Amino acid sequence: MTDSAKPEVSGLSFEKAVAELESIVARLERGDVALDESIEIYERGEALKKHCETLLSAAENRIEKIRLDRAGKPQGVEPLDGA
């Protein structure tokens, strides 16, 4: 896939971003990529990593913990981190 054909990082789902990031890591670990291309795909990898971190953070903020009363029955929800 050429650079112009690669989708914008911000438009990728978490799963697609992780898959592309894993592909980049594999290519860099093989060591058979030219220096200029290595730098280019490394920079895309950094952008993918940041995008994944942002998506994970947003997902964590949406997760809620169920509160139970003394009898163990659901009473409501609260943020997972207790905030």
Swiss-Prot record:
Keywords: Cytoplasm, Exonuclease, Hydrolase, Nuclease. GO terms for molecular function: exodeoxyribonuclease VII activity. It is found in: Cytoplasm. Transmembrane segments: none annotated. It catalyses: Exonucleolytic cleavage in either 5'- to 3'- or 3'- to 5'-direction to yield nucleoside 5'-phosphates. GO terms for cellular component: cytosol; exodeoxyribonuclease VII complex. Pfam families: Exonuc_VII_S. InterPro entries: Exonuc_VII_S, Exonuc_VII_ssu_sf. It is an enzyme of class 3 (hydrolase). Its EC number is 3.1.11.6. One of its GO terms (biological process) is DNA catabolic process. Bidirectionally degrades single-stranded DNA into large acid-insoluble oligonucleotides, which are then degraded further into small acid-soluble oligonucleotides. Heterooligomer composed of large and small subunits. Belongs to the XseB family. PANTHER family: EXODEOXYRIBONUCLEASE 7 SMALL SUBUNIT (PTHR34137:SF1). This is Exodeoxyribonuclease 7 small subunit. It comes from Rhizobium leguminosarum bv. trifolii (strain WSM2304).
